[in-house]
Curated annotation (Swiss-Prot):
Subunit-structure text: Heterotetramer of two type I and two type II keratins. Keratin-18 associates with keratin-8.
Descriptive protein name: Keratin, type I cytoskeletal 18
PROSITE patterns in UniProt: IF_ROD_1 (PS00226), IF_ROD_2 (PS51842)
Pfam families membership: Filament
Length: 435
């Protein structure tokens, strides 16, 4: 392919932000007949430039590797351009070989970086994310805390039930104690009745004794009077006959009176004895009943007191057990809090290491992306060189054509789309402008 005198420019545009993004290369060709021929190719500020003037021609090539790059130029005269064409092509081939060597080095560095990233992920990735042992330990601790909480709740419920039972027994004890006091007051009243009955019996016995003594005294007086009367009658020796009817015998009358008094006294004694025995029997029965009730109340009070003491002992034991369980629960919670804090610190440390590792991976990915960008730019420049050297069939001899040709401008716009250094699509737009 031959070029007429004119200018030829190649520009490469690539969007930044994606490693696998496509490249769009725009080739613009404008060829004024009387102007000098120039060739410029590059990508991202790095490339080569060939310029040919009317009296002199400058040929320069610049190569950039990395972010900056180097640039070299070479100028030859119009008469010596053809003689130096071979040296220029050799220099370009050397530079192309240097580009290829740089690309191979970058590919090796890229492979090494990928291997380091995979090795770092294999070494540190699973250990930072493998928290299953800690989860099992935490689950066991949570289960122990839950079991202790349930045991504590069960003991609290038992203590409450014991407290309610103790309250019920206390109420029963108070009611039985009031019954006991009422029974004791009744017993005291019955004892007073017994004492009064005994006093009445003693009074009646004393009255009986006094009546017996009075009866004996009356009998003695009566006998004394009878004897005196008999003696008087015997000493007087007077016999009186009375025509009146014979009166009652005095001895018989006295005997009747004596018998009547004795029967009355015996009747009174029998009635008093029967009443006293009946009353004493009733009092003894009532005393026996009250004594039995008192004994039963005393037995029940003793049993209730014994039960209350046993419940108080059990309550104290439950309280001491509750206190010990609360202390154990506090110690367990403290240990669990310390373990949780240690595990949290360990998790934070592991998360920090994971974040640092992610930062390192991200930094290495950024470096890898930068190297990949450089590689793609170099591939674009290599493609430009290949297109300029092989595809376009450029010959430097065409630059020496007579500059006095018809002056016209033909603008050819070639748009190429590159993906990973390969031409995907290409379009050409030609516009001729006359001067």
């Amino acid at each position: 392919m031959s070029y007429r005198p004119g200018s030829y420019s190649v520009s490469s545009m690539r969007p930044v932000g994606s490693v696998r993004s496509s490249q769009v290369m725009t080739v613009q060709r404008s060829m004024p007949l009387a102007s000098a021929a120039s060739v410029y190719g590059g990508a991202g500020g790095r490339g080569s430039r060939i310029s040919v003037g009317g009296s002199s021609s400058g040929f320069g090539s610049g190569l950039g590797s990395g972010a900056g790059g180097s640039y070299s130029s070479m100028s030859v005269s119009g008469s010596g351009l053809v003689g130096n064409e071979k040296e220029t092509m050799i220099g370009l081939n050397d530079r192309l070989a240097a580009y290829l060597e740089t690309v191979r080095n970058l590919e090796q560095a890229n492979s090494k970086l990928e291997f380091q990233i995979r090795e770092a992920l294999e070494k540190k990735g699973p250990t930072t994310r493998d928290l299953s042992p800690f989860e099992k330990t935490l689950e066991d601790l949570r289960k122990k805390v839950y079991d202790m909480t349930m045991d504590n709740s069960r003991l609290v419920l038992q203590i409450d039930n014991s407290r309610l039972a103790a309250d019920d027994f206390r109420v029963k004890f108070e009611s039985e104690y009031s019954i006991r006091q009422s029974v004791e007051s009744d017993i005291i009243g019955l004892r007073k009745v017994i004492d009064d009955t005994n006093m009445g019996r003693m009074n009646l016995e004393s009255e009986i004794e006094s009546l017996k003594e009075e009866l004996i005294f009356i009998k003695q007086n009566h006998n004394q009077e009878v004897n005196d009367l008999r003696n008087q009658i015997a000493q007087s020796g007077v016999q009186v006959d009375v025509d009146a009817p014979k009166g009652q015998d005095l001895a018989q009358v006295l005997a009747e009176v004596r018998a009547q008094y004795e029967s009355m006294a015996q009747k009174n004694r029998d009635e008093l004895k029967a009443w006293h025995e009946n009353k004493l029997t009733e009092v003894e029965v009532e005393v026996i009943q009250n004594t039995e009730a008192l004994q039963g109340a005393r037995t029940e009070v003793t049993e209730l007191r014994r039960q209350m003491q046993s419940l108080e002992i059990e309550l104290e034991s439950q309280r001491s057990m509750k206190a010990s369980l609360e202390d154990s629960l506090r110690d367990t919670e403290m240990r669990n809090n310390m373990e949780m804090e240690r595990y949290n610190n360990m998790i934070l440390q592991l998360e920090a290491e994971l974040g640092q590792l992610r930062g390192n991976i991200q930094m290495q990915a950024s470096e890898y992306e930068a190297l990949l960008n450089i590689k793609m730019k170099l591939e674009a420049e290599i493609a430009t060189y290949r297109r300029l050297l092989d595809g376009e069939d450029f010959r430097l001899q065409d630059a020496l054509v007579d500059q006095s040709s018809t002056k016209s401008i033909k603008k050819v716009t070639v748009t190429q789309t590159l993906v990973d250094g390969k031409v995907v699509s290409e379009s050409t737009n030609t516009k001729e402008i006359g001067k």
